[in-house]
Amino acid sequence: MESVEKTTNRSEQKCRKFLKSLIRKQPQDLLLVIGTGVSAAVAPGIRALCSWRSCIEAVIEAAEQLEVLHPGDVAEFRRKVMKDRDLLVVAHDLIRKMSPRTGDTKPNFFQDCLMEVFDSLEQHIQNPVVLRSILSLMDRGTMVLTTNYDNLLEIFGQQQSKPMESLDLKDKTKVLQWARGHIKYGVLHIHGLYTDPCGMVLDPSGYKDVTQDPEVMEVLQNLYRTKSFLFVGCGETLRDQIFQALFLYSVPNKVDLEHYMVVLKENEDHFFKHQADMLLHGIKVVSYGDCFDLFPGYVQDLATQICKQRSPDAERVDSTTLLGNACQDCAKRKLEENGIEVTKKVRQSDTDDAGGS
């Protein structure tokens, strides 16, 4: 029975159709937004990478083991994780609880908990197919933004000899360079990175220096207006307060935009309602299937389709080259018809050029 299901899944994957409006995009016209689904597919052995809920639960467990959180607080946060819908608020409160009472976020025990949770990430990469697909898009000019704390993409990219660079919103100069397309292999972590927890913020107030900076906001919002965002492995990104502050609620006329979101279709009614709702934000929702196991293969096939697109510049270069070669061939034939040895003519020309100056 299991083999039959796997065969069915594979056949579904082979027959899957992609939106022409998506696969005909030039890679450099896309901005890839990667969420926890990508990390979960790449390193399934790390529970904290599977979802926001799993990440918070893992941090609470680490805090308990390291004895940096009162047992009463441990119990309270576990209850909140189970009951509260807004996990970002829970995570924010958890960081505050492990930070100085002055409200300053550094130093804090949250950093130690994250280091415990994400220890030796490079050893846990089991299924790199999604990362390889993302890198193939980056090679061709696709920009990448993530809500994840981990740097699995950067680790894998460096293993492939790519000059990967992790960026966060605290560094204005780098953000501007990235947004203007000057850091080809840069990955912007809008929540920060676990290796630098001092730069991690979970609510818009922590980024007031960014959101109140007209220059930074203009270049970021311009990306949302001019690029097609492709959300991959993102379940809660549109509810993310940071993402909302930077893009979703700050860019007008969103229905005129064309973005894409790849999701799991667990329930048909919910999926089609979600699809209709997202069109109001200019986002086309598509499904990779009803099973998470289909996700890596879907991303691989999608990236392959997009990477097949030839850039207009490349086509112009090719046509010019072909025309140039054709002209040279015509000239060569005419010379040969007149009994002139082409190789000698070329050598004579080379000699003249060498001494001409």
Swiss-Prot record:
Positions of transmembrane segments: 30-46
Domain of life: Eukaryota
GO MF annotation terms: identical protein binding
Cellular component terms per the entry's GO annotation: membrane
Annotated membrane topology: Single-pass membrane protein
Modified residues (N-acetylmethionine): 1
Sites bearing Phosphoserine, chain numbering: 311
UniProt keyword terms in alphabetical order: Acetylation, Membrane, Phosphoprotein, Transmembrane, Transmembrane helix
Keyword Cell membrane part of the UniProt annotation: no
Subcellular location as annotated: Membrane
InterPro entries per the UniProt record, alphabetical: FAM118
Family named by the database record: Belongs to the FAM118 family.
PANTHER family: PROTEIN FAM118A, PROTEIN FAM118B
Protein name per the record: Protein FAM118A
Species for this entry: Mus musculus
